[in-house]
Amino acid sequence: MTKQELEKKLAAYRSELRKMGVVSLAVFGSVARNDSTQQSDIDLLVDFDRDIGLFYLFEIQHRLEEIIGVSKIDLIQKGALHPALKEQILSEAVNVA
């Protein structure tokens, strides 16, 4: 999947995502670098307008898998990035919703 395909799929659901508390959603990793393959997962970085629990994060991940039409999403909260990886992830992250 390309960044453009991902943006197109998410565009129709921006309002729903905002109602669910999603402030921003960015892709990073192979999809952001345009070197993904059929086996690649989709790495998404999410930021919420409120504190959420782990079960809610899984609920959002499941909904995104439905919207995008894949079952290979890694969803991580922006505030939970490991310090050793944070700079690299943020430098390649591309906002998609």
Predicted regions and their residues:
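Short hydrophobic/aromatic beta-strand micro-patches
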Residues: 45-49
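Conserved histidines in hydrophobic membrane contexts and catalytic metal-binding motifs
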Residues: 27
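Structural signature of the urease/amidohydrolase superfamily beta/alpha-barrel
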Residues: 41-43
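Catalytic core of pol beta-like nucleotidyltransferases
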Residues: 1-24, 32-38, 50-97
